[in-house]
């Protein structure tokens, strides 16, 4: 049960079949003594991703649940309608063709809008969500995740020579990507957080997820760098293209073997 402080709780679940109550459920807190929180606290930042340091959800966070059934149709609560992207790939990757207007008619870059408004995003995956195509998988899903980078192409922000099947999240901050239950699985695809010049991205959390059959990275954290032949100040780097990913917390995930049916690259 995400979003609870450490303590003891009674839980009641009511369904069409009846009601069941479980008492004295103990909730333990995560260890938040690592560098993601240590460095954040030094800069006056509290709470990594969509959660506060006590484990509760930030009061203004937007939460979206993603399943295999709704992976290409879901929209963020409060951000629905034809002007907003639909599907988790198009929501997170503004370079996807269905989000940036190449074929989708032009959508609002919702991730950057949330960043500008100071609204955290919590993406909760339920069950197995499958991605991939005939180039990367021996058993691709009936419908690939729209918005994934293309295989060996620049489609949806991809790179020639890459195996693709990545959601590339640009210029964002305060995002939690998490699994609900012990079977939340990203099968055949991965997520990459990317900073760009002038947009230092910070505050990312990946937790309670299984990754399997990933043809590229399962999780990627990619900043930009600046090069100088002589020592420079921190301010120089920040004004000359240096944009790191800051305060990233990757924990309690399981990484299974990756797979690509027909690798487009040799590394």
Regions found by a protein language model. Name each.
Residues 1-124, 128-163:
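Extracellular "leader-to-stem" segments immediately downstream of a signal peptide or signal-anchor
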Residues 130-267:
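Right-handed parallel beta-helix
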């Amino acid at each position: 049960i995400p979003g609870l402080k450490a303590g003891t709780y009674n839980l009641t679940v009511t369904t069409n079949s009846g009601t069941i109550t479980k008492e004295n459920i103990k909730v333990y807190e995560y260890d938040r003594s690592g560098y993601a929180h240590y460095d954040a606290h030094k800069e006056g930042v509290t709470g990594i991703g969509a959660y506060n340091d006590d484990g509760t959800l930030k009061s203004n966070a937007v939460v979206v649940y993603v399943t295999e059934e709704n992976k290409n149709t879901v929209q963020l609560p409060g951000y629905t309608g034809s002007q907003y992207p639909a599907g988790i790939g198009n929501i997170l990757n503004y370079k996807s063709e269905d989000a940036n207007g190449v074929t989708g008619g032009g959508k609002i870059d919702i991730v950057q809008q949330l960043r500008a408004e100071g609204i955290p995003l919590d993406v909760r995956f339920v069950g197995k969500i499958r991605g991939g195509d005939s180039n990367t998988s021996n058993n691709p899903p009936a419908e690939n995740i729209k918005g994934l980078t293309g295989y060996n192409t620049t489609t949806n922000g991809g790179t020639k020579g890459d195996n693709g099947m990545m959601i590339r999240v640009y210029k964002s901050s305060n995002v939690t990507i998490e699994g609900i239950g012990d079977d939340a699985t990203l099968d055949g695809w991965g997520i990459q957080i990317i900073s760009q010049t002038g947009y230092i991205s910070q505050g990312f959390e990946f937790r309670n997820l299984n990754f399997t059959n990933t043809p590229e990275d399962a999780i990627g954290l990619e900043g930009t760098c600046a090069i100088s032949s002589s020592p420079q100040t921190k301010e120089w780097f920040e004004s000359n293209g240096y944009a790191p990913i800051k305060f990233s917390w990757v924990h309690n995930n399981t990484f299974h073997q990756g797979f690509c049916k027909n690798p487009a690259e040799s590394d």
